[in-house]
A protein has these predicted regions:
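Short, charged, surface-exposed secondary-structure boundary motifs
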Residues: 86-88, 110-113, 188-189, 220-225
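His/acidic metal-ligating clusters that form di-metal
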Residues: 32-45, 69, 130-200
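Conserved catalytic scaffold of divalent metal-dependent phosphoesterases
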Residues: 9-12, 86-172
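Binuclear metal-dependent phosphoesterase catalytic core
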Residues: 15-17, 21-24, 31-35, 109, ...
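A short, conserved beta-to-alpha structural element at the edge of catalytic cores
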Residues: 28-39, 77-91, 225
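Metal-dependent catalytic neighborhoods of phosphoester/phosphodiester hydrolases
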Residues: 16, 49-69, 84-98, 126-128, ...
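Active-site neighborhood of phospho(di)ester-bond hydrolases with catalytic His/Asp-centered motifs
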Residues: 5-7, 46-51, 75-81, 101-104, ...
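N-terminal active-site segment of His-dependent metallophosphoesterases
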Residues: 1-70, 142-156
């Protein structure tokens, strides 16, 4: 069983919102992503770390969730900052196709892989509201990590999904990365970063944890092999 990741699909199946206005890398990007998944099997896992759909409400997001459900393997999703349709986790789960799992304040175990996740927040947002949101996300991340610990048994592999980068432009340690180290996470996947000028390393290892950027435009619309 292999684990792959790709994020920031920004789907709009029923109400097309052209993404190529953001650059040629977005030309036919969904076709490129699908081609990159052709080698996946039904036993493999695909992680999608947020910004799944442009929809504003859950009913409008259903076609996008069905698109995700039709991708190969078992899918695990988290909320991104543009997923305005994602409000109640129970409501979201009621609309998920078979084989799609949503993580929020908890975790899921598939085979020998335990996956947790949370949206996170920008470490660079020093506004009062930003500090409040960052603190709240720390609590949620810790809840998910605790849930992972309860599911984990000897020999299991652990992956945490977070939408926002967990560190700053200098890749310095943060309260979020300290939590990952405390719980001994193997791999962290994240997205959110876009454009030619963003501070992006596709792979970075710090204190024994591998961090993988999976924003589709940053990885040439090709799913990243995680495990």
């Amino acid at each position: 069983m292999k684990v792959y990741a790709i994020s920031d699909l920004h789907l709009s199946i029923n109400n097309p919102k052209p993404m190529d206005v953001f650059g040629t890398v977005w030309d036919n990007y969904l076709d490129d992503i699908v081609r990159s998944l052709e080698g996946m099997t039904s036993d493999d896992i695909l992680l999608l770390a947020g910004d799944l759909s442009w929809a504003m409400g859950l009913p409008q997001a259903v076609p996008d969730l069905e698109y995700i459900g039709a991708l190969p393997g078992k899918k695990v999703i988290i909320r991104g900052n543009h997923d305005y349709w994602w409000k109640s986790i129970s409501a979201v789960r009621s609309k998920l196709p078979n084989g799609v799992f949503a993580v929020q304040n908890d975790a899921v175990k598939i085979g020998d892989v335990v996956v947790g996740g949370s949206r996170g927040w920008s470490v660079d947002d020093k506004s009062e509201d930003g500090k409040r949101l960052y603190t709240r996300e720390l609590i949620r991340i810790d809840m998910s990590l605790q849930a992972m610990q309860k599911l984990k048994t000897e020999g299991d592999r652990t992956v945490f999904m977070i939408h926002y980068p967990p560190f700053n432009v200098k890749f310095e340690g943060t309260p979020v990365t300290e939590l990952f180290e405390k719980y001994g996470i193997d791999v962290v996947v994240y997205g959110h970063l876009h454009g030619k000028n963003c501070y992006a390393r596709k792979s970075y290892t710090k204190n024994g944890i591998k961090y993988l950027l999976t924003s589709c435009d940053q990885v040439n619309n090709t799913a990243v092999l995680v495990l």
